[in-house]
Amino acid sequence: MKKIFAITLMLLMSTLTINAQINDLTEQDIQAFKDRVGEVIDMFQNNLSILGSKKSTAKVKAVYKKSALKLFIGEGLPFKDLNDGKERPGVQMQVSKTMNGKSTVVGTKPLTEYLDNLIKLPYAEVKLTKADTYRISNIYKVGDHYEATATIFQRFEGYVGKEMKKKYGDVTQKNIRVYIVPENDYVLGQHWSVRLGDIEVVDTTN
């Protein structure tokens, strides 16, 4: 009987430890993390608008492309998965469009290729803006870091000709994998850093 009680107690303590690892964030911590994730997403959206704009020079776009890559885990290069340690080919992004009023996922591209294609789009002007407020799912702990999913709504508009006539436009709902990882540097010391991950398309509408 004592042996059974001891085993039960050990299992209970194990469960409490797991729960403590998952729920060791205060409401203030969670809100601070969500605020920081929102800031990083806004930075990414701003970078995209510069890269898509035909008013920006190639030199300026090179700077903003580098800035955009720094927001992502691996910075567009292959990286080790934080969960299983396996080598990943780099952050991937789904792209989509609407055809006959229906959402179609065109394919999945590496982040670097997506940014290069955005720069080279054959429009006289491209506008990428935030169509709605972002949403961030529950933040949960995985090993020594935290993860979450951010949902954004992005409006795309492509214009042609000197009269700047809109040729194409859509609003896409996207889910972004988010990593909140511990980092240490000489300036900030030990701190939490937000990195974005793979981006998938949920839906695209006109």
Give each language-model segment a name.
Residues 40, 63-64, 112, 174-176:
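Well-ordered, non-membrane alpha-helical segments in soluble/globular domains
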Residues 66-80, 177-183:
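A short, hydrophobic secondary-structure junction motif
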Residues 20-66:
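Short, low-complexity N-terminal intrinsically disordered segments enriched in polar/charged residues
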Residues 46, 50-66, 70, 128-134, ...:
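Short glycine-rich, low-complexity/disordered patches
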Residues 127-206:
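Exposed beta-sheet edge and beta->alpha loop/turn motif
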Residues 71, 75-139:
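A solvent-exposed, acidic/Ser-Thr-rich amphipathic alpha-helical stretch
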Residues 1-27:
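Bacterial Sec-dependent N-terminal signal peptides
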